[in-house]
Amino acid sequence: MPPLTVVQLLPALESGGVERSTLEIAEALVRAGHRALVVSAGGRLLPALEATGARHLRLDIGRKSLVSLRHVPALRRLFARERVDIVHARSRLPAWLARFALRGMGTDAPAFVTTVHGLNSPSRYSAVMASGTRVICVSETVRRHVLEHYPRTDPARLRVIPRGVDPARFPRAPWRDAAARAAVAAEHPALDGSGALLLLPGRGTRLKGHVDALQLLARMRADGEDARLWMPGARDPGRAAYVAELETLARTLGIEGAVAITAPTAAMPAAYAASDLVLQLSRRPEAFGRTVLEARAVGRPVLGWDHGGVGETLRAWQPEGAVEPFDADALRAAAHLLLARPPRPPATMPDTLRAMQDATLAVYDELSD
């Protein structure tokens, strides 16, 4: 493959799967001798992006306002000035702005790639994500979603490339890891105890299933299990009212002394190591189940609702943890079973991150001729 210049577009570089994938592909491009450009409003992951050797150009292309159209000429000039070969849009508004910019470039226009990271509600606005010359779907669930809701999409343009995990970043931990548990309990005393530690990572939104996790904990403790629950990420800025609801529910259930509702942690490998059972209880089907891969890499069992990309990933990696959505009795039974007889983790975890990077660069190669 000749050296390419690839620009990735996304709203910002704060946190999340879209941002993480952007950094991972920037790293792969630079490693392979290509030029990696990223356009966004910036954010706390900017230093990590620049550490990959990628170049960042600051434009607020995620602001949902007609004012954002003023960035179209700037993007067009950028694509021409940098002799961009491929424009890769990772969310809807940046994709629309890129489409408008490319329309004015004629035969000199770069190839257009999109990645569908989520299961957005079908609409004309969302349809832009299915309009790339190549459309990367992060799971078979996403591919089916695209073909069902945008039937004019040519299936030959779709490429399924699951998100990946670097096993070196999520090293296998002993079962059970007393040192990791002690470190977590020192920071969050409610998590101290000899019973199971349940972990539900995720943002402070109702869709992440925090209520289901609290109810599961209450039922397990009623069964005589000294279980504890840690929900890192639920205490989001601006989500004080939601956190207050969760705290009220915990008190009502009589489990407030066994729950830690905290801000996100940057030490997720250590969080997995400290836990005995990882929960993925999103109320709405999600595009992919990266948490499943991360937890299995560390050697922890996962319990989740069997729908969307999470169900797809669980069935592939640990089918014992896939439970009929919203069946609280089945969830409780599966939790006890996974703790009593945790499934053996893979002897070695494949480098699914490198596989994702290689597959994405192969898509770029398809369009570079």
Language-model regions: role of each:
Residues 16-24, 196, 203-219:
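A conserved mid-protein helix/loop that constitutes part of the nucleotide-sugar donor-binding site
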Residues 38, 301-304:
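Short hydrophobic beta-strand element within catalytic cores of glycosyltransferases
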Residues 79, 264-265, 271-275:
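Short alpha-helical donor nucleotide-sugar binding micro-motif in glycosyltransferases
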Residues 89-95, 116:
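Short His-centered aromatic/hydrophobic patch
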Residues 103-140, 151-152:
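A conserved, positively charged/aromatic
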Residues 243-263:
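Nucleotide-activated donor-binding/catalytic signature segment of Leloir-type glycosyltransferases, i.e.
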Residues 273-287:
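Acidic donor-binding loop of glycosyltransferase active sites
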Residues 316-329, 336-341:
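Conserved acidic donor-binding segment of nucleotide-sugar-dependent glycosyltransferases
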